[in-house]
Swiss-Prot record:
Source organism per UniProt: Campylobacter jejuni subsp. jejuni serotype O:6 (strain 81116 / NCTC 11828)
Coiled coil regions in record: none
Enzyme class at the top of the EC tree: hydrolase
Purpose of the protein: Digests double-stranded RNA. Involved in the processing of primary rRNA transcript to yield the immediate precursors to the large and small rRNAs (23S and 16S). Processes some mRNAs, and tRNAs when they are encoded in the rRNA operon. Processes pre-crRNA and tracrRNA of type II CRISPR loci if present in the organism.
Enzyme Commission code: 3.1.26.3
Names of required cofactors: Mg(2+)
RNase III domain mapped to chain residues: 4-127
CDD domains recorded: DSRM_RNAse_III_family (cd10845), RIBOc (cd00593)
Lineage, top ranks: Bacteria, Pseudomonadati, Campylobacterota, Epsilonproteobacteria, Campylobacterales
Annotated signal peptide: none
Gene3D superfamilies documented for this protein: 3.30.160.20, Ribonuclease III domain
Name under which the protein is recorded: Ribonuclease 3
One GO MF term: double-stranded RNA binding
Boundaries of every DRBM domain copy: 154-223
GO CC field: cytoplasm
Amino acid sequence: MKNIEKLEQSLTYEFKDKNLLIHALTHKSFKKSYNNERLEFLGDAVLDLVVGEYLFHKFAKDAEGDLSKLRAALVNEKSFAKIANSLNLGDFIFMSVAEENNGGKEKPSILSDALEAIIGAIHLEAGFEFAKTIALRLIEKNFPQIDAKILIKDYKTKLQEITQGKIGQTPQYETVRAFGPDHLKQFEIALMLDGKELARAIAGSKKEAQQMAAKIALEKLGAL
């Protein structure tokens, strides 16, 4: 049995029903009669509302579109995996030996899903306000500067606006290669403008690599 008391201490929440926490920590590969997918579904909805309400009050003058971008920057696999890592959540997840040997304890998708499942479990046992308090504490701890300019790093849109305005061209993003094991896949992206390569970047997803390449291009153009 994993020492889930350590996890409860990190969460600052002690489950009355320990089986509910174990349920939230059980990945589908563990081959039990239950897994955390349904709790993940619930936790995802709770976190979406928690973050939406938080941003609504924190950025009272911002338009709906900006709030949606902010929420998308916080409510995603990468952000939740970061929070999960701060809790050492991978050490507590129940999964098959095969999944663990395949890097399952470090997979952002598994970590993110488990975090959502835990929030869903807290909501079930203690109610929305309790889940909200814990979720916000974790978010603020891991993202101390919740600021639009910091979170919304949409370099692709900014670059496109500049290039279309100045030369009437839209940047193109080409996948040069994908490499590495499945759980640590890397993508190399080349940013092409008017048939010429302007920048190149490597990241763990195509979207992230495209954003990095766009940032490099903006720096070259003196727009950052």
